[in-house]
Regions:
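N-terminal export signals
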Residues: 2-4, 10-32
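Flavin (FAD/FMN)-binding glycine-rich loop and adjacent Rossmann-like elements that form
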Residues: 41-44, 49, 69, 75-80, ...
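N-terminal Rossmann-fold NAD(P) dinucleotide-binding loop
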Residues: 98
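Conserved beta-strand-loop-beta-strand element in the redox core of flavoprotein oxidoreductases
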Residues: 212-231
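Beta1/beta-strand and adjacent pyrophosphate-binding region of the FAD-binding site
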Residues: 84-95
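C-terminal segment of N-terminal export signals and the immediately downstream linker at the start
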Residues: 5, 26-83
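Loop/turn elements at helix/coil->beta-strand transitions in domains of secreted/extracellular proteins
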Residues: 87-88, 108-111, 198-200, 234-235, ...
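Conserved N-terminal/central alpha/beta ligand/cofactor-binding core
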Residues: 16, 38-63, 104, 110-111, ...
Length: 472
């Protein structure tokens, strides 16, 4: 058949997707407006046996140069930005914290938008191939463990287990509440959970770069995409960027620290080695005990050097170095009996930046308080312990409120903690805990017409408890 015009239904039928895709209503179309594609031609390409949809796209106001040279300096004049979207709450960053914040906000009744720079949710959990969900529980008398990161985090883990996306073990190093989860399964599950919320709009491939500010109050965010720079207006903003990017742009004070820049490599054909061969080579960086969500695959987590996780040159050097080290490991393994077929399946698309900015908030949680398990009247959740040797500790709501800035909350690894506490709050489940609290608070405060700082924390705690969160 030569090139021909086809209806959308015919196009889907030829792909074998007709009934499913049309019934779902979201396989094709503009996710921002939820409108169908405009009339146009689906062109069959006989060279590849596929179809392409071709239509003209009108230019946008942002499709113009915005910087110029003058007197040897690069200048960027003020210009009007298109308003892409409006919401009650906008969450910037779709990692574990942003995922939970957006869900919590939408479920609390607020019209919510989630802006994420990559094409999937999960952040370092999925795009960074971190996999293992640690810090979910605390050790209790008798050697048992108590799950403390419930709420949205608990829901996510239960659903991941039900869909067969996780490996659960009961040994002392992992326990029944610290699964290793397939990153692709996690992406799909997160997609399903956010797409089920009518109050939630997700915008991928959009990088939050600035804030819309009115004095000390935040009125929205500015994001960059292939369509140019645009704005989303909102009553409340939740910074889940991990680096406190939004709070930084809003002028919040912060402390910047260095940490290891990690890198994860996924290797294949490991399953051909015998358990004895794996055990014998464990000291050389080879896999020890099979604990992977995909049979025959092995995830190598490189700790990486200390570095500035915001510095472009350092990040670039780390990317080069990690990939080279990964390939050298493969070469070493291929020269070892049982590992001859080893190959690189995947490398993380997101470098393992563990900590950068710690935002100055209304309260800073220190190590002494975490060790003493200090009780706070405004506790919004708990952090577990990945070793099960220490008890869980409370996280106060005030650690989510950037000092001197209104209408903004922060969640994830940039909350107000001392540097020596960061390794206990940057964990995947704890980020979900602070994200859920921040999203709930943002929605409640927007509905009540008060700032997050003026929100009745007792009402917030009641709502979190009603939703399954563990507060003590």
């Amino acid at each position: 058949m030569s090139m021909l015009q086809m209806t959308k239904r015919e196009f889907l039928r030829r792909l074998g997707l007709g009934g499913v895709a049309l019934a779902g209503g979201a396989a094709f179309g503009d996710e921002a407006t939820r409108e169908p594609l405009p009339p146009g031609d689906y062109i069959a390409d006989p060279r590849y046996g596929t179809c392409r949809y071709i239509r003209d796209i009108p230019k946008m106001p942002t499709d113009v140069p915005s910087a110029f040279l003058k007197g040897g300096k690069v200048l960027q004049p003020a210009r009007e930005l298109p308003v892409f979207h409006e919401a009650d709450v906008v969450v910037v960053g779709g990692g574990p914290a942003g995922f939970a914040a957006a869900l919590a906000s939408a479920r609390t009744g607020a019209k919510t938008a989630l802006v994420e720079r990559y094409g999937s949710l999960g952040g370092l959990f999925t795009n960074g191939l971190v996999l293992i969900v640690i810090g979910t529980a605390e050790g209790v008398r008798g050697g048992a463990q108590r799950l403390v990161t419930r709420g949205i985090c608990g829901e996510f883990m239960e659903r991941a287990k039900a869909m067969g996306a996780g490996v659960y073990r009961t040994d002392r190093h992992h326990g029944p509440h610290q699964p290793t989860i397939d990153p692709e399964g996690a992406k799909v599950l997160m997609d399903r959970m956010v797409r089920a919320e009518q109050n939630l709009d997700v915008f991928f491939h959009a990088w939050g770069v600035d804030v819309v500010q009115d004095g000390a109050e935040i009125r929205g965010v500015v994001f960059e995409s292939k369509q140019g720079r645009q704005a989303i207006l909102a009553k409340r903003v939740v910074d889940c960027t991990g680096d406190g990017d939004v709070a930084f742009q809003a002028g919040a004070d912060f402390r910047q620290i260095t940490h290891n820049l990690g890198f994860v490599t996924q290797l294949g054909s490991i399953g051909r080695a015998t358990p004895e061969q794996m055990s014998a080579k464990a000291a050389d960086g080879f896999p020890k005990v099979p604990n992977e969500p995909i049979p025959g695959a092995f995830w190598r987590n490189w700790l990486g050097p200390q570095g500035n996780g915001l510095a472009v040159r350092e990040l670039t050097a780390a990317e080069f170095g990690h990939r080279e080290a990964s390939w050298r490991l493969v070469e070493k393994m291929r020269a070892t009996p049982g590992f001859e077929s080893t190959y690189v399946m995947n490398t993380c698309s997101q470098l393992g930046v563990r900590a950068t900015r710690l935002i100055k908030t209304d309260y800073t949680l220190d190590m002494g308080e975490t060790n003493a398990q200090t009780v706070f009247d405004d506790a919004i959740g708990l952090s577990g312990d990945d070793t099960f040797t220490r008890g869980a500790f409370q996280i106060p709501y005030r650690t989510l409120l950037p000092s001197g800035v209104e209408n903004l909350l922060v969640a994830g690894r940039a909350i107000g903690v001392a540097p020596n506490v960061i390794d206990r709050v940057r964990l995947i489940p704890v980020c979900m805990v602070t994200g859920e609290a921040a999203g709930t608070a943002a929605a409640l405060s927007a509905t009540a017409g008060v700032t997050p700082r003026a929100l009745d924390v007792r009402a917030l705690r009641r709502r979190l408890a009603d939703n399954g969160a563990c507060l003590a």
